[in-house]
Amino acid sequence: MLTHLDSLGRASMVDVTDKAVTAREAVAEARVRMLPQTLQLIQQGGHPKGDVFAVARIAGIQAAKKTHELIPLCHPLLLTSIKVELQADGEDSVLIRAVCKLAGQTGVEMEALTAASVAALTIYDMCKAVDRGMVIEGVRLLEKLGGKSGHWQVQA
């Protein structure tokens, strides 16, 4: 059953009024593939626009806080923790991992996915002048904890 449709098939925000407040957490990832020299430029701090990882981290955090403004039926949430980690993975990619937490009545999967996605988009934006062929890929939920459905983790 699709939770965002009412009995007539119309889009509607899920009513979480009667749901218990529980600890919720979600982990998402994204990857940006690029030319090896682009990654070297980022790692050496030689990018003319500044620290690419720092800006992407802040963009991801800000995006998680604004998820309800971007995705129409998401609830506005009082997130208690947002972490966005970026690391070089091999010679030609950056792996982004976002973790969102709260004590609340609905999950934080969309916030974690939005954080990872916007961090990836920010890397693309900052580096497109030197590498227009970058590819954003592998945006996915890795893990979700809390709520009625409990713990879910992606299968390896």
From Swiss-Prot:
GO molecular function, one term: cyclic pyranopterin monophosphate synthase activity
Recorded metabolic or biological pathway in which this protein acts: Cofactor biosynthesis; molybdopterin biosynthesis
GO BP of this protein: Mo-molybdopterin cofactor biosynthetic process
Binding site for substrate: 73-75, 110-111
UniProt KW keywords: Lyase, Molybdenum cofactor biosynthesis
Pfam families listed in its UniProt record: MoaC
Catalytic reaction equation(s): (8S)-3',8-cyclo-7,8-dihydroguanosine 5'-triphosphate = cyclic pyranopterin phosphate + diphosphate
Catalytic residues identified in the record: 125
SUPFAM superfamilies: Molybdenum cofactor biosynthesis protein C, MoaC (SSF55040)
Subunit details: Homohexamer; trimer of dimers.
Similarity annotation: Belongs to the MoaC family.
Protein name per Swiss-Prot or TrEMBL: Cyclic pyranopterin monophosphate synthase
Organism: Stutzerimonas stutzeri (strain A1501)
Gene transcribed to yield this protein: moaC
